[in-house]
Amino acid sequence: MMAASGRIRKRKHKSHTSGDVPSTTTSVPMPIPTMAPGKMVAETMEEAAALAGDYNNFTHNFVDLQNLLSFNELNGTSGSGGTAVSSLGSSSAIKLNNSAITDTLLGTVLTTATATVAPAASSLLATLAATTTASARGSLAGKSLAIADATSSTYYSNLLNLSPATTSLISAAAATKSYNDSALRWEQLDGSVDFGFDPLYRHSLAMSMVYCVAYIVVFLVGLIGNSFVIAVVLRAPRMRTVTNYFIVNLAIADILVIVFCLPATLIGNIFVPWMLGWLMCKFVPYIQGVSVAASVYSLIAVSLDRFIAIWWPLKQMTKRRARIMIIGIWVIALVTTIPWLLFFDLVPAEEVFSDALVSAYSQPQFLCQEVWPPGTDGNLYFLLANLVACYLLPMSLITLCYVLIWIKVSTRSIPGESKDAQMDRMQQKSKVKVIKMLVAVVILFVLSWLPLYVIFARIKFGSDISQEEFEILKKVMPVAQWLGSSNSCINPILYSVNKKYRRGFAAIIKSRSCCGRLRYYDNVAIASSTTSTRKSSHYHQNSSRKSPSSKGNAVSYIYEHNSLRRHNMMLKQDSNLSQQMLLKQDSHGSRQFLIKQESSCSDASGIRRPLCQQDSNGSKVSLSKQDSIVSYMEARRSAGHGLNDTLVDRDSVSMDVGRRQGATPSSLLDKRQKFVKQDSVISFVDQRPEQRRHQLVKQDSVISFADQRRGLLHKQDSLMANRTGDAPTHHVSILKKTDSQLSYGSSTSPRRNADLYE
């Protein structure tokens, strides 16, 4: 967002024919011949210089004094003295070093100048440099005159030691100032760009106010929105997915742009000199380059993650790999932009602008620009490191990834009307929604930065910029810089379209705590972006294949449920389910996975029943999960018989729990069970025949069991053995764990309709 920098190209001005140039005269100690208006001005100055014997001291790089010293025709008088116009060549400063040029002549020149410059001539950087002093020795000391305050005759008298007559002449002329600033321009090098001559402000007050409002809106929306995105992902464990990690990284880069670069860009669009000092001149361009590079590389990582997930579901990107990639993104961004840190520096305004542009302020003014060592081509670095590495090449790679993703999704056919086909369609629809959102993020990124890159490329690699082009660039440049900055606040608006982020934003707004966990949980952060979705796609295609055990997946997670106020049982399994998954949508809109399992289990009476089937009389059922197989069984007993459940861990853990007798079959069957799995899939079947709404949650290879009474979980890697007798049976329940710890929690106070998750 830094403006293109360059050195001064001193432009040769066209010759102009002097028009009528009336000027005021006054009585002075040393008379000056009266000149004809306009036509005689140049001759008068030449004669004065010739009399001084110092015509050759008129330096080159002449600023068109006819434009600079437009005589005020309202004065209606022609007088002595004048200025050299185009015939004197090209000089930005007139150096008169002979006592023959008296302060009267100088006063006449100053009068015509101050009568035609701005009321606040401090805005005039195009200066008339003239030197003269009357001295007893007859020599004049050369000094540069900067017309900085036309209303202050004391300034000139003190600077040049003028006579009282000349001082009064300047004061009188200052009271009748009339000028037209259209001819007064700065000359900026890269393309002979003529900047407005105002040494302090680039734009009018009205335009500056418009820029302030626009930048403040971007600052507030971007800072709050990106902070919300980071908070949603960090505070909700279910949002911590690979894709969301890259989105958080993108939000961090946007916050850096907003905090460090946005205010500096606004100040640079209002003021001509650099107002923030040497350290910020080094730091701001560097942080801007780092943050933009990190944003681009994060978008590349997201597109590659989606591409791999769609084309090769088995080659998943783990969270550990995602963290390594994020570290690599920042290392590359920090290294590739080091030249901005080294070669941006403060440059005095006198070295940047032509000799005529001499600042009249007491403190020297500086500009923040690129200062490359001799023999180094800074344009080449811009071409390779910025335009190609941070824009053209990344955008091409991202476009290719999403085109291939779209081809894969659009050509995939799901025949039939089975429940499995319906589930696949819903999965595919969810993936397409996520891809559309990410594509929108990329397109807006390209459009936001495109105008600024085009302008920089035109300035650095194009021909000389004409006056008309400069007038356009002067208005377009701040808008292009604002568009690039506004990209930092667009992404949170796009994320709010996603239901999970929208709920997370609402939860943060309602939450009083800024650091606690959100009560909002959903099954996935962004549908189809989690690791489990890739696994489920694999199981559809390779149902009999057993997934390898992964250390990263061996996660136990116990929720502190606010409704039940107790720990839930968690069981981690690594077995494989040989059947398909069905997708179900509950009342809350979360898409859940149900298992269709054709294996069988035996109840206490030895009857073989299919798993996941519900009889109308509420008979015993079994539950199974994807990525681990868990079956649940209970025995119905007559009134008066007690229940003695035994949880047996074949690894060496067993527990006998006695229950009170007298429980009836109906009271047992009326108990509601809830099962929750994470990063795999579990199905839930109610014991009662009437339709009930069930809620399932998934997250990371963990299954949880919450019951109002003692129950039984069985891992379907090995058969479950039921111990029965001839007498009225006391059912023995067996619970087996494989490779992670099992926690079991129960409550004696029944809560039938308590939701496990808010």
UniProtKB/Swiss-Prot annotation:
<feature type="transmembrane region" description="Helical; Name=4">
    <location>
        <begin position="283"/>
        <end position="303"/>
    </location>
</feature>
<feature type="transmembrane region" description="Helical; Name=7">
    <location>
        <begin position="437"/>
        <end position="457"/>
    </location>
</feature>
<dbReference type="GO" id="GO:0008340">
    <property type="term" value="P:determination of adult lifespan"/>
</dbReference>
<feature type="region of interest" description="Disordered">
    <location>
        <begin position="532"/>
        <end position="553"/>
    </location>
</feature>
<feature type="topological domain" description="Cytoplasmic">
    <location>
        <begin position="276"/>
        <end position="282"/>
    </location>
</feature>
<dbReference type="GO" id="GO:0004983">
    <property type="term" value="F:neuropeptide Y receptor activity"/>
</dbReference>
<keyword id="KW-1133">Transmembrane helix</keyword>
<feature type="transmembrane region" description="Helical; Name=5">
    <location>
        <begin position="324"/>
        <end position="344"/>
    </location>
</feature>
<dbReference type="Pfam" id="PF00001">
    <property type="entry name" value="7tm_1"/>
</dbReference>
<dbReference type="GO" id="GO:0007218">
    <property type="term" value="P:neuropeptide signaling pathway"/>
</dbReference>
<dbReference type="InterPro" id="IPR000276">
    <property type="entry name" value="GPCR_Rhodpsn"/>
</dbReference>
<dbReference type="GO" id="GO:0048047">
    <property type="term" value="P:mating behavior, sex discrimination"/>
</dbReference>
<keyword id="KW-0675">Receptor</keyword>
<protein>
    <recommendedName>
        <fullName>Neuropeptide SIFamide receptor</fullName>
    </recommendedName>
</protein>
<feature type="topological domain" description="Extracellular">
    <location>
        <begin position="234"/>
        <end position="254"/>
    </location>
</feature>
<dbReference type="GO" id="GO:0016020">
    <property type="term" value="C:membrane"/>
</dbReference>
<keyword id="KW-0325">Glycoprotein</keyword>
<feature type="transmembrane region" description="Helical; Name=1">
    <location>
        <begin position="105"/>
        <end position="125"/>
    </location>
</feature>
<feature type="transmembrane region" description="Helical; Name=2">
    <location>
        <begin position="213"/>
        <end position="233"/>
    </location>
</feature>
<dbReference type="GO" id="GO:0007186">
    <property type="term" value="P:G protein-coupled receptor signaling pathway"/>
</dbReference>
<feature type="transmembrane region" description="Helical; Name=6">
    <location>
        <begin position="387"/>
        <end position="407"/>
    </location>
</feature>
<feature type="glycosylation site" description="N-linked (GlcNAc...) asparagine">
    <location>
        <position position="75"/>
    </location>
</feature>
<feature type="glycosylation site" description="N-linked (GlcNAc...) asparagine">
    <location>
        <position position="57"/>
    </location>
</feature>
<dbReference type="InterPro" id="IPR017452">
    <property type="entry name" value="GPCR_Rhodpsn_7TM"/>
</dbReference>
<keyword id="KW-1003">Cell membrane</keyword>
<feature type="topological domain" description="Cytoplasmic">
    <location>
        <begin position="345"/>
        <end position="386"/>
    </location>
</feature>
<feature type="compositionally biased region" description="Basic residues">
    <location>
        <begin position="7"/>
        <end position="16"/>
    </location>
</feature>
<feature type="topological domain" description="Extracellular">
    <location>
        <begin position="408"/>
        <end position="436"/>
    </location>
</feature>
<feature type="topological domain" description="Cytoplasmic">
    <location>
        <begin position="126"/>
        <end position="212"/>
    </location>
</feature>
<feature type="topological domain" description="Extracellular">
    <location>
        <begin position="1"/>
        <end position="104"/>
    </location>
</feature>
<dbReference type="GO" id="GO:0008188">
    <property type="term" value="F:neuropeptide receptor activity"/>
</dbReference>
<dbReference type="GO" id="GO:0032870">
    <property type="term" value="P:cellular response to hormone stimulus"/>
</dbReference>
<feature type="compositionally biased region" description="Polar residues">
    <location>
        <begin position="18"/>
        <end position="28"/>
    </location>
</feature>
<feature type="glycosylation site" description="N-linked (GlcNAc...) asparagine">
    <location>
        <position position="97"/>
    </location>
</feature>
<feature type="topological domain" description="Cytoplasmic">
    <location>
        <begin position="458"/>
        <end position="758"/>
    </location>
</feature>
<feature type="topological domain" description="Extracellular">
    <location>
        <begin position="304"/>
        <end position="323"/>
    </location>
</feature>
<dbReference type="InterPro" id="IPR000611">
    <property type="entry name" value="NPY_rcpt"/>
</dbReference>
<dbReference type="GO" id="GO:0008528">
    <property type="term" value="F:G protein-coupled peptide receptor activity"/>
</dbReference>
<feature type="region of interest" description="Disordered">
    <location>
        <begin position="1"/>
        <end position="33"/>
    </location>
</feature>
<comment type="similarity">
    <text>Belongs to the G-protein coupled receptor 1 family.</text>
</comment>
<dbReference type="GO" id="GO:0005886">
    <property type="term" value="C:plasma membrane"/>
</dbReference>
<keyword id="KW-0085">Behavior</keyword>
